[in-house]
């Protein structure tokens, strides 16, 4: 189910839309009555919550919708799971709940025991949702798992995100806006590797546990932009440095040792 907001794209479902075991429902996860009705119809065994407002800049402009979707929506889904009974509820989260790491300490990585220290309204809403999921596990015994991933990239990504935005602007010879000095570091994870990790957690992960999912692909934003320009044969003169984002996290880096050692997962796609 999906609300199909500005970033929704039904064409991504074309390969599966005619499958007998697939059904798409347009719905807002904050609509408790509609969600309960769907659960009563379908009686799902597993619920995976990918639904989220996820763009940091938009969360700075309007935090309210992030709190509604990311926290209230999560509570509605879990209440429905409690009401109708499920085998597993999985919460898809983000490494941004941990805050950031200093650039001069490449030896530091986020682990599952790293304290939550969110920097933006977006990451704060995701951290709040994670805490709520943990509370439903402890209070109600809801069979939950949580995954926290690094920055995703891949087919169909909405062009407000760094990689598709830079590619589209470069192809059209438009300026490529880079925040601050461009040295902010992100760990990149291919979307299919992410999905395989989630599938593994659902089937083999321990109830009540959190798993970090990282790609082992750390790179500064400016280096990614320059790489894109090189691959497309475009000049670096298209790069335009702009005022830095408020509260911009400096570095993200995930240690995925837990999911590797316990479940055998490793990213297959090199950045």
Regions found by a protein language model. Give the residues of each.
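Residues that form or flank phosphate/diphosphate-binding pockets in enzymes
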Residues: 8, 33, 157, 219-223, ...
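C-terminal substrate-binding subdomain of Rossmann-fold SDR/epimerase-dehydratase oxidoreductases
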Residues: 27, 164, 170-271
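Short, cationic motifs built from Arg/Lys/His that form the positively charged side of catalytic pockets
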Residues: 126, 148-151, 156, 186, ...
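Short, solvent-exposed loop/helix junctions and linker helices
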Residues: 68-71, 122, 126, 156, ...
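Hydrophobic alpha-helix immediately C-terminal to the catalytic Tyr-X-X-X-Lys motif of short-chain
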Residues: 128, 132, 136, 166, ...
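Gly/Ser/Thr-rich beta-alpha loop segments that engage phosphate groups in nucleotides
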Residues: 10, 75, 101, 125, ...
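N-terminal Rossmann-like NAD(P)+-binding domain of SDR-like oxidoreductases, especially those catalyzing
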Residues: 1-152, 192, 265
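Short aromatic-enriched loop/helix-cap "lid" or pocket-rim segments at secondary-structure transitions
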Residues: 10-13, 101-104, 157-160, 224-225, ...
């Amino acid at each position: 189910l999906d609300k199909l907001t500005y970033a929704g794209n039904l064409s991504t479902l074309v390969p599966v839309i005619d499958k007998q075991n697939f059904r798409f429902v347009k719905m807002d996860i904050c609509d408790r009555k509609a969600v309960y009705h769907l659960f009563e119809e379908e009686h799902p065994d597993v619920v995976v919550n990918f639904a989220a407002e996820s763009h940091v800049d938009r969360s700075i402009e309007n935090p309210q919708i992030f709190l509604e979707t990311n926290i209230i929506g999560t509570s509605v889904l879990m209440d429905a799971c409690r009401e109708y009974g499920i085998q597993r509820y999985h919460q898809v989260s983000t490494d941004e709940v941990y805050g950031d790491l200093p650039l001069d300490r490449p030896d530091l990585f986020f682990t599952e025991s790293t304290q939550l220290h969110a920097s933006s309204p977006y990451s704060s809403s995701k951290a709040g949702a994670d805490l709520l999921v943990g509370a439903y596990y402890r209070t109600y015994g809801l069979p939950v798992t949580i995954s926290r991933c690094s920055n995703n990239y891949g087919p169909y990504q909405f062009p407000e995100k760094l990689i598709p935005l830079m590619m589209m602007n470069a192809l059209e010879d438009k300026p490529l806006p880079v925040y601050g000095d461009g040295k902010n570091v992100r760990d990149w994870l291919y979307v299919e590797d992410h999905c395989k990790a989630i599938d593994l957690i659902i089937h083999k992960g321990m109830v009540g546990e959190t798993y970090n999912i990282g790609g082992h692909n750390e790179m500064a934003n400016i280096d990614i932009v320059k790489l894109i320009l090189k691959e497309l044969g475009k000049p670096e003169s298209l790069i335009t440095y702009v005022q830095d984002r408020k509260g911009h996290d400096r570095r993200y880096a995930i240690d995925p040792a837990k999911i590797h050692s316990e479940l055998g997962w490793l990213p297959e796609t090199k950045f």
